[in-house]
Amino acid sequence: MYDLTALRQQTDEIIDNLLKDGSDPEALHIIEHHIAHHDFDKLEKLVVDAYKLGYEISEAEEIEDDQGNVLFVCDIVSEVKLNGDIITAQQQELLPLIEKAAAEYEGWGTYFEDPNAEEDEYGDDGEFFDDEDEADFNNAKVH
């Protein structure tokens, strides 16, 4: 069980620091909720459920933890205003899925959005994921 009060405090601190550093408060930010699991199939089921809720999913990677155990990690991604209420609502929606899958929620992150940038770093359409990535996910075999 995750402590939503502590998560909200962390969220508020992250947002405050980004805004103090000058990140654009009006920009949409890519929010990446970091997930880890020792079982790829269970992680895959979790991210399919998150995808059905409207989130994008980054490609899973295999890593080793400090003890040499294999973990599979990925991000559940959205693009929203940098707003604590929105991010907390996402956590409240995702944490039951994460707990059900016995996965680990490792917090969330985002990128600095320069208010003076002339061009979107994600290209002309401003999309974090391109249509090919989405098509690849939709065509992936689900176990």
Swiss-Prot record:
Keyword Ribonucleoprotein applies: no
Subunit-structure text: Interacts with the C-terminal region of Rne.
Name the record gives this protein: Regulator of ribonuclease activity B
SUPFAM superfamilies: Hypothetical protein VC0424
Localization, UniProt: Cytoplasm
One Gene Ontology CC term in the entry: cytoplasm
InterPro entries: RraB (IPR016716), RraB-like_sf (IPR036701), RraB_dom (IPR009671)
Principal place of residence: cytoplasm
General function of this protein: Globally modulates RNA abundance by binding to RNase E (Rne) and regulating its endonucleolytic activity. Can modulate Rne action in a substrate-dependent manner by altering the composition of the degradosome.
Regions of compositional bias (Acidic residues) in chain numbering: 115-136
Domain of life: Bacteria
Location of region: Disordered: 113-143
Source species taxonomy: Bacteria, Pseudomonadati, Pseudomonadota, Gammaproteobacteria, Pasteurellales
